[in-house]
């Protein structure tokens, strides 16, 4: 089992952990429907960038 040679200081520990923070998902609002969605994803209604790209109800029924 590996054992450290010298104790790591609080500063070095915290500097290592500085990259561990979680980020919130980036959300967008569709200009047509006003729905909130993930960036580069369509809304649950099937809109993307203000255009209807898929009929969400029929696509769900086909699966």
Swiss-Prot record:
**GO CC field:** large ribosomal subunit
Q: Where is this region: Disordered?
A: 1-45
Ribosomal protein among the record's keywords?
Answer: yes
Q: Which residue stretches does the UniProt record annotate as biased composition, category Basic residues?
A: 7-16
- Biological processes, Gene Ontology terms: translation
* Alphabetical list of Pfam families matching this protein: Ribosomal_L32p
Q: Which residues fall in a compositionally biased region of kind Polar residues? A: 25-35
Q: Which InterPro entries match?
A: Ribosomal_bL32, Ribosomal_bL32_bact, Ribosomal_zn-bd
User: Signal peptide location in the record?
Assistant: none
Domain of life according to the entry: Bacteria
Q: Keywords for this entry?
A: Ribonucleoprotein, Ribosomal protein
Q: Which GO terms describe its molecular function?
A: structural constituent of ribosome
Q: Does the keyword Transmembrane apply?
A: no
Q: Which family does it belong to?
A: Belongs to the bacterial ribosomal protein bL32 family.
Q: What is this protein called?
A: Large ribosomal subunit protein bL32
Q: Which organism is it from?
A: Legionella pneumophila subsp. pneumophila (strain Philadelphia 1 / ATCC 33152 / DSM 7513)
């Amino acid at each position: 089992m590996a054992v450290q040679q010298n104790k790591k200081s609080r500063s070095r520990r915290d500097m290592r952990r500085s990259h561990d923070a979680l980020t919130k998902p980036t959300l967008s609002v569709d200009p047509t429907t006003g729905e909130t969605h993930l960036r580069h994803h369509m809304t649950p209604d099937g809109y993307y960038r203000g255009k209807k790209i898929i009929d969400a109800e029929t696509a769900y029924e086909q699966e």
